[in-house]
């Protein structure tokens, strides 16, 4: 009914240089129309409707705020000299010279 008696053959080259042959046959068949009926959606009762719960017990607890960043550590300034020991002017007199 839908098959033609004549078949077509085509010869082609592959990317690798190999030859291959396709046998082309056409199938012609008439399709019958599909009949469908439109189904009206049924009205759902109030029990079947999905509603987001709004009660206090249904709400998820809120997360606490994120911790704050710590302030940056003050770095020592190299320009300031700290003198731990100030030698007295007569400090050299403490030492005895030996020859």
Swiss-Prot record:
Q: In its keyword annotation, does this UniProt entry include Cell cycle? A: yes
Q: What induces it?
A: Up-regulated by DNA damage and oxidative stress. Down-regulated by iron excess treatment.
* A GO term, aspect molecular function: protein kinase inhibitor activity
Give the protein's recorded name: Cyclin-dependent protein kinase inhibitor SMR7
The top of its lineage is: Eukaryota, Viridiplantae, Streptophyta, Embryophyta, Tracheophyta
Keyword tags? Cell cycle, Protein kinase inhibitor
A Gene Ontology biological process in which this protein takes part is: DNA damage response
The annotated region (Disordered) lies at 49-70
């Amino acid at each position: 009914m839908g098959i033609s008696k004549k078949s077509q053959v085509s010869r082609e080259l592959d990317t690798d240089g190999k030859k291959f042959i396709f046998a082309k046959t056409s199938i012609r068949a008439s399709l019958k129309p599909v009949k469908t009926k439109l189904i009206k959606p049924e009205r759902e009762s109030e029990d079947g409707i999905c509603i987001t719960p709004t009660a206090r017990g249904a709400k998820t607890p809120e997360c606490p705020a994120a911790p704050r960043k710590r302030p940056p550590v003050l770095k020592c300034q190299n320009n300031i000299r700290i003198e731990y020991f100030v030698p007295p002017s007569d400090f050299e007199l403490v030492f005895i010279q030996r020859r």
